[in-house]
Amino acid sequence: MSPALDHTVSFEKYHGTGNDFVVVDGTEPVPYRGAFAEAHCHRETGVADESGAHDRRGADGVLFLALEDRFHPPRIVMTLVQPDGSFAAMCGNGARCAAAWAAARTDASEFMIDTQSGTKRAVVRGKPGGDDSADITVEMGRPTFEPRDVPLAADRDDKLVAEEVKGLEVTAVNTGVPHAVAFVDNVDAVDLDAVAPAVRHADAFPEGANVTLASRDEDGGFSQRTFERGVEGETRSCGTGAVAIVAAAKRLGLVDGDDLIRVSPPGGDLEITVPDGGSATLRGPVEAEYGGRLAARPEQ
């Protein structure tokens, strides 16, 4: 094998409430980032912990991160490549993992994260390592329901709020990426893999949409399940989806005010605020799992 094909790059594996990512320094030479993500994120043949301490293969995406610590606070340039090789403009849990990765390399506890959907501020409490997790809050920007921002089909000039799309009553909102949010009686009673793809590919969403289900819990929070565009399946957690739930709930009058709302995807609890006049926030734990080296140009 030629030296170019045999080249490997260092990586670390992080997860935020089960939403897991391969993290690679953005300065590492990876010639085809899409192919890299397709190979190493695969749930059956992708990245694995050689120690056996973590038995889940693959990942929900690859975070290519460039740390620019000459700024105060330090900046992180974040590029997320999904398992299908596509690029995502924003990922809430990915941004929280990016902040944890940077915190392990600096003495800073605050970072500015440059994403394709704008710059997000993150605050880190603690540093992940061993059995510890970091508590990280990231500002997510203001959710928008505007048709051009979601985006919705070009011939539509009104918001999509509590309308039926392919069998689900959904509300469309962009929280960095588009979400079709449906409130149901019990998220666990829905066959997500059966109902979500039709909505994800509906004509109403020319760029596709993540499909997020929510049901109200007894304590006033929400249970969550999300079928992610680019992953093309359910993930254990979706930060933009959690924010989308609270934004849609406010739009529909299910919650009001600026209070913190708990949203619980399968991977754990997240805390969300969607203020009337400011940026939404996403808070939750991040853990570092393991690291190693991966082929920079995996065989196709």
Q: What do the PLM-derived regions correspond to, one by one?
A:
Residues 1-133, 181-300:
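A glycine-rich beta-to-alpha transition motif near the start of alpha/beta enzyme domains, typified by
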Residues 143-145, 288:
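Active-site/binding-pocket entry motifs
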Residues 145-168:
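Active-site glycine-rich loop that binds ribose-phosphate moieties when present
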Residues 11, 169-170:
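Short beta-strand/turn micro-motifs at beta-sheet edges
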